[in-house]
From Swiss-Prot:
Its cofactor is Mg(2+). Its EC number is 2.7.7.59, 3.1.4.-. It comes from Acinetobacter baumannii (strain ACICU). The gene is glnD. Residues 700-782, 809-887 form the ACT domain. This is Bifunctional uridylyltransferase/uridylyl-removing enzyme. Has four distinct domains: an N-terminal nucleotidyltransferase (NT) domain responsible for UTase activity, a central HD domain that encodes UR activity, and two C-terminal ACT domains that seem to have a role in glutamine sensing. Gene3D superfamilies: Hypothetical protein af1432, Nucleotidyltransferases domain 2. Residues 457-579 form the HD domain. The keyword Magnesium applies. It comes from the Bacteria. One of its GO terms (biological process) is regulation of nitrogen utilization.
Amino acid sequence: MINTSPLLNYVSSHHDIKAINQWRTDVEKQLQDSYENGQSIREIIKARSDLVDEALVFLWKHAELDQSKLGLFAVGGYGRREMLPYSDVDIMILSEDEISEENEKRISTFISSLWDVGNFKPGISVRTIQSCVEQAATDLTVATTLIEARLITGNTQLAKWPRRIVSQTWTDKTFYDAKMAEQAKRYHQHNNTESNLEPDIKNAPGGIRDINQIGWIAKRHFRVNRIYDLVHLGFISEFELAVLEEAESFLWEIRHHLHRLAKRDENRLLFDHQREIAAKFGYVRQEGQPVNYGVEQFMKRYYRTAQQVSTLNEMLLAYFSESVITPRLPNYERKIEVVNDHFKIVDNKLAVQHHKIFAEHPSAILELFYILANRPDIEGIRARTLRLLILAAKRINQSYRDNPEHQALFMSIIRSPYRLYDTLVAMKRYGVLGNYIPAFAQIMGLMQYDLFHIYTVDAHTLLLLRNLNRFREPEFAKEFPVVSSVFQRLARQDIVFIAALFHDIAKGRGGDHSELGAEDAIEFGRAHGFTERECKLIAWLIQNHLLMSLTAQKKDISDPDVVKDFAEKLGDMEHLDYLYTLTVADINATNPKLWNTWRASLMRQLYTHARDVIRTGLGRPVDYQMLIEDTKFAASELLVNNFALADVEKVWQELGDEYFIKESADEIAWHTQAILKHGDNPEPLVLLRAHRKAAQDAVQIFIYTRDQPNLFATTVAVLDRMNLDVQDAKIITASTAFSLDTYVVLDRFGTLLTDPEREETVKNALVKALSQPDQYPGLMQRRIPRQLRHFDIENTVDVTLNEALQQNMVEISTLDHPGLLARVGGLFMMQGLDIHSARIATLGERAEDIFFVTKKDGKPLNNEEVKLFSEKLKAALDEASNQICQH
């Protein structure tokens, strides 16, 4: 029990009303001690509310308001006796009539003393019954406040008025409709998902507000004080109540820790606090477990809890609408359409024919979703049916899964061309998908503690399936023209759907999730009618689902050998087509910021180049001489009308074969035309244009200037200052000691090519910096994003020799931060290394960049030099990461 000295004695012994401040501090310490000694969070928050009551009653009497006919009401969370350490103390002073001048003075004294105490955050309203009526009629917030107004002290005759006022000003329907619209708006503000990376545990879907919402609507109609009272009225079952109360306690407990850590009223479960709160719940990484295991398991519990709450919110409020609101509508006539012996459609929602359907016909569980998937006109599931379905889903066992009828029904759902995504989301939400595929249940709510994977694994998987389904819809053909065409000619689209369903299903188990997922998929495929050959293809897709994205991201796909090696791993067009569709859908389901026209162009180029290699024959070696001649001919055709062939060839003879192997004819013509027009002008040449293959958000910057030691470092430092993100870089040195550099950048603001003034600013900044090779612009200090400070990423540096190019390939993986590329470029410059090309990839908080370098003499580093350089680069990255974490 919580023992506190009576407030009156405490204040009397200190001879000062402000002693309430110290009293509350002492009480708060006792509450925390009680919590740490095992007292439940429910008892703690109620005790805190009661102690605040005691303080307010004391101050009420101190202001002589006990001699008035006014009433003091607790409202909001305080009205519900839900007080966390830094919760606001929301109160309402209510009067039956206009407030007298004497009482106004007393109220002023009361309010002043509240602020003088200094330990309260009061939110105060002073109203008459008439003003309550007027405000409640037009303000939903006021009406909601009145529903749970609780009389603390004062005129007991006023206790009945708050709810009476709401009954007078709002009908069941108007209040329900307004609260549901308010909830929809709140959901939209939180991305309509329970699984945000940094969820607001109070306001996001599945948060405390969803539980409050059930209470507000039920209290308005049933006139009850507690959700518990709804059990006796048949509105909620004892099981559902237990789930809600357990979830509510868990959310309160998180909020309790958030308040104490932030030392304020904080509802956002930020990265700043997730790991520490996880530890307070006992989720601590053990030896041998992944570094983020504890926090990921804690967040998994949170996401699952939020899913339970939002599902119950949906079901109970739909039940209220169907059983209370709709039947009372004027001229209401129930519309019923019989579907079959098991189901009917009632008011556009699917319902069972009788309450024993799922028990007597277990196949009806999956049949319900088959109907939903193929009837776009059905708006959802009736609440009574939903309640039966959730209970029935718990009875799905191995015998159920092994039933051929059930297996056929499941595959019919997967093959549905209409509402696959919505149907699978519903199957997951109501417990069917996780029970039918137990491995899927293991990834439900599983998050990856990073900024790259912004969805839980289960949500990502279903979004991937949604994307695949969209490839067959005409409205998305413009956005994904090539992949949509490829998808629509797949012989068996269900093969890629099953590969998608299982591609990440083994995450969180330990081991290689691709291999483990492939094993699960083979077992599933055999049971669900796929041939051995089809099962092998599904398994191959799962094992290699990252192959295409990693090749495009980390390798130079303008190199024919890279493309040939990739094509040989595929073997035929069937594997290429399936992998391409899976890869594009996967990237788009991982993080919306990850997919852009530059990345789309890389995927498209890799697909078309690999297709050409497969069609011409995998065994044929690359004929580089023919490739060079074909490229030169195509480029010359673009130039022939404007320049003499002799002038063109004069420029080209200064460039090596690699240039004509890796650059397209269009780019060669662009470069050549610019160089010829520039003539003998000693000033660096800088040109910008939209990337011809990547379109709107990717910009090509071409630089032609005398070669200099710090060319790359200077260029990326300037681009960083201009808020341009480098994605790709090629640096080619001609035999005349001139450098031809092409950078692909993403413009964060999207105005680089539409704002002439900004374009000119970028050009001038580059020309000025490159004209002063001895004046390196240096790093620009930028604000470090808050989230980055909470990720412990191991910096890695891997330096290998590319035998064919005789260049060192430097791969770095580090915590991404503003100015990283400029910092790395500066280090290369100081070490006397020339950069020939670079591939830049940012994956959430992680940067994975690749550079091809040589020494000044054009030779690669030897083993000893590699060792020394690797150590210096690693030390520099470690120093930068430490600065970020301490920022």
